[in-house]
């Protein structure tokens, strides 16, 4: 089985499907992935779901199981199967117990989330999936859908088992002020400097920056609007809701310098366009940004990613005392809980600053 990129007739939208060994689309996956495309899920999300569900179908085929007759125990075996080396999944090679898992716990949980979403969608549309969903409580399952006759049984306890692999919560990777300055100073062009400065100050995502239009920048008000829309470069606003973010006068001046000294008379709605490679004036793409990051890593001598600038912005705001509700709105999170879960981390230095500000280390009633 393999995953195939497809283009939706008429709209030209990008989607993905899963083909069996004969090159025929796997029907339930084909319909589900088409549904995700129809409801405007990100192409990257649809692609990830396609690969995750492909893996489950390979597992089912290896055990001769029908997807509609899967039991909770089969899901548990699937988790164990995922963590085997590729050579051990077919059963031809014995795997010693001491061999480390080949798939990270976070990846396993992501695949389980995709699988849970698929089964919930099938049940919602009348497919008979047996008693799987009545026994399985996927980790982090959300949504307002409730099964038929839910009102009859909602007061009764219905214990369900969660299947998830324990994962340590990774801390967001952030950059220090000297590192950010080094990155900006290493940029050869104002366009690149403005792009990275925008991400560091506003906390926007790469896709939100690449989809930016000139009309989205209100220079007098020093505000930038990030608006979900279809973009020629496939850039996307992940949040799905427009938001307006205040920015500094310095960032607006940098935008003006970029327009005056590099952008010139180009006729394009997009703020970030090809100027030095590729079709001049065409909207800048994700690969172009990732290539820029790779070149800058070599120049500055340390590793970083584009998303680190967003993490740095959020962490800096919170450390400077910006209320978490404001930070959540600026980042475009769906809820404050998301912001708290991602950025509610403290280093020892953060804790010391908070305790010193509260006078914890001075004026003690007990002497040592």
Q: Where do the language-model regions lie?
A:
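N-terminal core-binding DNA-recognition domain of tyrosine recombinases/integrases
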Residues: 29-44, 54-150, 182
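Short, basic (Lys/Arg/His-rich) helix/loop patches that form interaction surfaces
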Residues: 290-329, 333-336, 345, 355
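C-terminal secondary-structure termini that scaffold catalytic or DNA-interacting sites
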Residues: 1-4, 278, 358-368
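Basic, Lys/Arg- and aromatic-enriched nucleic-acid-binding interface segment
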Residues: 167-206, 210, 266
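Active-site/catalytic core of tyrosine-dependent DNA strand-transfer enzymes
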Residues: 248-301
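Conserved tyrosine-mediated DNA breakage-rejoining catalytic core shared by Y-recombinases
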Residues: 207, 211-253
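Flexible interdomain linker/hinge and immediately adjacent N-terminus
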Residues: 128-181, 275-280
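Short, charged phosphate-coordinating catalytic segments
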Residues: 125-129, 199-222, 280, 325-326
């Amino acid at each position: 089985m393999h995953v195939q990129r497809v283009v939706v007739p008429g709209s030209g939208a990008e989607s993905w499907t899963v083909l069996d060994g004969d090159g025929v689309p796997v029907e339930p996956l084909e319909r589900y992935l088409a549904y995700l495309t129809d409801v405007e899920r990100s192409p990257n999300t649809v692609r990830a779901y396609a690969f995750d569900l492909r893996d489950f179908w390979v597992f089912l085929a290896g055990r001769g199981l029908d997807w509609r007759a899967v039991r909770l125990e089969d899901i548990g075996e699937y988790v164990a199967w995922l963590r085997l080396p590729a050579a051990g999944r077919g059963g031809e090679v014995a795997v010693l117990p001491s061999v480390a898992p080949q798939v990270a716990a976070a990846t396993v949980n992501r695949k389980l989330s995709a699988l849970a979403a698929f089964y919930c969608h099938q049940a919602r549309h009348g497919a008979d999936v047996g008693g799987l969903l009545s026994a399985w409580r996927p980790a982090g399952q959300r949504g307002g859908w409730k099964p038929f006759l839910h009102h009859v049984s909602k007061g009764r306890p219905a214990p369900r088992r969660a299947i998830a692999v324990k994962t340590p919560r990774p801390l967001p990777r952030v950059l220090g002020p000297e590192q950010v300055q080094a990155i900006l100073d290493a940029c050869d062009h104002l366009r690149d400097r403005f792009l990275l400065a925008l991400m560091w100050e506003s906390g926007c995502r790469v896709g939100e920056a690449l989809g930016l239009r000139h009309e989205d920048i209100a220079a007098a008000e020093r505000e930038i609007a990030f608006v979900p829309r279809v973009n020629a470069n496939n850039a996307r606003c992940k949040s799905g809701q427009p938001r307006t973010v205040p920015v500094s006068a310095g960032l607006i001046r940098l935008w003006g310098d970029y327009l005056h000294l590099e952008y010139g008379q180009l006729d394009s709605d997009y703020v970030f366009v090809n100027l030095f490679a590729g079709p001049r004036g065409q909207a800048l793409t994700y690969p172009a940004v990732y290539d820029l990051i790779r070149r800058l890593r070599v120049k500055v001598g340390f590793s970083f990613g584009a998303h680190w600038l967003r993490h740095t912005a959020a962490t800096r705001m919170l450390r400077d005392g910006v209320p978490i509700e404001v930070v959540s709105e600026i980042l475009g999170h769906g809820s404050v809980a998301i912001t708290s879960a991602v950025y509610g981390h403290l280093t020892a230095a953060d804790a010391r600053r908070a305790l010193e500000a509260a006078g914890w280390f001075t004026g003690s009633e007990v002497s040592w």
